[in-house]
Amino acid sequence: MDIRPAEISDILKQQIASFDQVETVSETGTVLSIGDGIARVYGLTNVMAGEMVEFEGTGLKGMALNLEADNVGVVLFGDGDSIREGDTVLRTKSVVEVPVGKGLLGRVVDGLGNPIDGRGPLTDVEYRRAEVKAPGIMPRQSVSEPMQTGIKAIDALVPIGRGQRELIIGDRQTGKTAILIDTIVAQKPVNAEGDPKKSLYCIYVAVGQKRSTVANLVRTLIEHGAMEYSIVVAATASDAAPMQYLAPYTACAMGEYFRDNGMHALVCYDDLSKQAVAYRQMSLLLRRPPAREAFPGDVFYLHSRLLERAAKMSDANGGGSLTALPVIETQAGDTAAYIPTNVISITDGQIFLETDLFYRGIRPAVNVGGSVSRVGSAAQIKAMKQVAGKIKLELAQYREMAAFSQFASDLDAATRKQLDRGARLVELLKQPETSPLPVEEQVVVLYAGTRGYVDPIAVDKVVAYEAALLSELRGAGSDILTAIRNDRQIKPETEGKLKELLEAFGKRFSA
């Protein structure tokens, strides 16, 4: 047989030239054990803390939290029943990223930002890390713009500013969520103006709540036309603990998009007690050492790194803001427990809601003495300052006198007058759910209360008086409301008109 070397070498050259090396290199690990939503994985030596990993063949994702010498502790974002010992785990080489942007407005998403409202995929969004470092000192400025809640007791006595963190704390069933919903609904007239520098986009995050509760809340927002400028993030009680742990950070990242683009956002965390419980569950299952109340040692950092991301940015940094309203549920009014004291120390003030007040029909059940805003009147318009300063003092004196009068048999006229005025002011601060008032209407109502126009009215008629007064103002007194809204203060000529209206209305109401 005739062998031709030249021909063979040509064939070899062609083979070598046409050889195409296609290979995919992926770092993998192996499941050592699985149980209670925790997977122990061998391998993945270069995995990052907080990195997303994927379990091959199941599509299930997890997050690497414990990086130990011989294995990695992974928490699962779902049910791990389909995972078996020996399964392959793949690195994604990315830390948890969530969708942000205006495309989320009006949508309901889960703890990772995936839509769960059945309205198709998200559009007009970009992706950001769920956990980022909070802004430093220099990019911030002090809180100066009011964030109106529409609730008289809060806007007058415990004012909240844009960029502030105000804790809402109280036992279960005291109206904590109602305050959040009212605040979101109260932004409708502001957002209707369409001014991006004034609009306030709202994000509500439900942690560990019933699905039926979240569905009712979404329905309420839709009924009041508030869903169009709101995002609901829901990590319900049936979701895995890592989803409940992550949901507040996801919501915060969504709010930061607005803050960093010179807009204003509000994030309502309902509630951080359940997030702490979910984190405790994960930490104990990962065998991290427990501390007080079995919480891990870094549970303070869990909440501080979240709430520090709320800020009012300086004008050089766009002047945007992110306001935080975290909620903490107490057990039998015990505000000295571990998580309540932690969050009280992190926030810029707190609104205490009391069961006793709630059952006495004083709703919202705000304990005025125990509630405080560390931003104070810097977060109020001048008109509100003109009427609110007096109401604080009168309510404080009323509480003192009411306690004293229980033991005194006969009271002098001045004390009796103070008690009567206080009782009427308490009635005046009552407000039904989902009926927030614009700030100019609040100012007029409180003006009537502090200047003695409500004193002749019987205590049980005060609520009816207020409703009738507001109706009168929206009709005959609309110019007064417009003047207060535009001037942001009660000018002498406006005050003259207001006094005339209140005197005439008082006579008609009492007749």
From Swiss-Prot:
<comment type="function">
    <text>Produces ATP from ADP in the presence of a proton gradient across the membrane. The alpha chain is a regulatory subunit.</text>
</comment>
<comment type="similarity">
    <text>Belongs to the ATPase alpha/beta chains family.</text>
</comment>
<dbReference type="InterPro" id="IPR023366">
    <property type="entry name" value="ATP_synth_asu-like_sf"/>
</dbReference>
<comment type="subunit">
    <text>F-type ATPases have 2 components, CF(1) - the catalytic core - and CF(0) - the membrane proton channel. CF(1) has five subunits: alpha(3), beta(3), gamma(1), delta(1), epsilon(1). CF(0) has three main subunits: a(1), b(2) and c(9-12). The alpha and beta chains form an alternating ring which encloses part of the gamma chain. CF(1) is attached to CF(0) by a central stalk formed by the gamma and epsilon chains, while a peripheral stalk is formed by the delta and b chains.</text>
</comment>
<dbReference type="GO" id="GO:0045259">
    <property type="term" value="C:proton-transporting ATP synthase complex"/>
</dbReference>
<keyword id="KW-0066">ATP synthesis</keyword>
<keyword id="KW-0375">Hydrogen ion transport</keyword>
<dbReference type="InterPro" id="IPR036121">
    <property type="entry name" value="ATPase_F1/V1/A1_a/bsu_N_sf"/>
</dbReference>
<dbReference type="Pfam" id="PF00006">
    <property type="entry name" value="ATP-synt_ab"/>
</dbReference>
<dbReference type="InterPro" id="IPR000793">
    <property type="entry name" value="ATP_synth_asu_C"/>
</dbReference>
<dbReference type="InterPro" id="IPR033732">
    <property type="entry name" value="ATP_synth_F1_a_nt-bd_dom"/>
</dbReference>
<protein>
    <recommendedName>
        <fullName>ATP synthase subunit alpha 1</fullName>
        <ecNumber>7.1.2.2</ecNumber>
    </recommendedName>
</protein>
<keyword id="KW-0997">Cell inner membrane</keyword>
<keyword id="KW-0139">CF(1)</keyword>
<dbReference type="InterPro" id="IPR027417">
    <property type="entry name" value="P-loop_NTPase"/>
</dbReference>
<dbReference type="GO" id="GO:0005524">
    <property type="term" value="F:ATP binding"/>
</dbReference>
<feature type="binding site">
    <location>
        <begin position="170"/>
        <end position="177"/>
    </location>
    <ligand>
        <name>ATP</name>
    </ligand>
</feature>
<dbReference type="InterPro" id="IPR004100">
    <property type="entry name" value="ATPase_F1/V1/A1_a/bsu_N"/>
</dbReference>
<keyword id="KW-0406">Ion transport</keyword>
<keyword id="KW-0813">Transport</keyword>
<feature type="site" description="Required for activity">
    <location>
        <position position="371"/>
    </location>
</feature>
<dbReference type="InterPro" id="IPR038376">
    <property type="entry name" value="ATP_synth_asu_C_sf"/>
</dbReference>
<keyword id="KW-0067">ATP-binding</keyword>
<dbReference type="GO" id="GO:0043531">
    <property type="term" value="F:ADP binding"/>
</dbReference>
<keyword id="KW-1278">Translocase</keyword>
<keyword id="KW-1003">Cell membrane</keyword>
<dbReference type="Pfam" id="PF02874">
    <property type="entry name" value="ATP-synt_ab_N"/>
</dbReference>
<keyword id="KW-0547">Nucleotide-binding</keyword>
<keyword id="KW-0472">Membrane</keyword>
<dbReference type="InterPro" id="IPR020003">
    <property type="entry name" value="ATPase_a/bsu_AS"/>
</dbReference>
<dbReference type="GO" id="GO:0005886">
    <property type="term" value="C:plasma membrane"/>
</dbReference>
<dbReference type="GO" id="GO:0046933">
    <property type="term" value="F:proton-transporting ATP synthase activity, rotational mechanism"/>
</dbReference>
<dbReference type="InterPro" id="IPR005294">
    <property type="entry name" value="ATP_synth_F1_asu"/>
</dbReference>
<dbReference type="InterPro" id="IPR000194">
    <property type="entry name" value="ATPase_F1/V1/A1_a/bsu_nucl-bd"/>
</dbReference>
<dbReference type="Pfam" id="PF00306">
    <property type="entry name" value="ATP-synt_ab_C"/>
</dbReference>
